[in-house]
């Protein structure tokens, strides 16, 4: 895994949320198979790609999950903290957007598995002359490049 992941408690989650106020961050909600995931980030490129990659969700609908993509020199390089009860993730120092997208899809999958017995894979699908091919591989291996 190119980044370290750590589970945190609800109190630690609240502490992070208090420290990294949502004001001044770009925010957008995405509808991922009916799961609403909200991204908060200071990176305009990340928010633009988020809006390009996912269907927009209404701001009037409460998010099932939240991702805070934060740049902070005091935090370790590319570290993910996840609080499972509220499905809140803090992504520190992630410059590669593909990981942000992958984590959002993973959290949506986590919710869908628990509530609907729906299981997902990380891949790309290609249809050529009515013949389908699926590429399944980890992030940053070129699935999109090969299937675009």
Predicted regions and their residues:
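A noncatalytic interaction/capping subdomain that flanks phosphate/NTP-handling catalytic cores
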Residues: 1-132
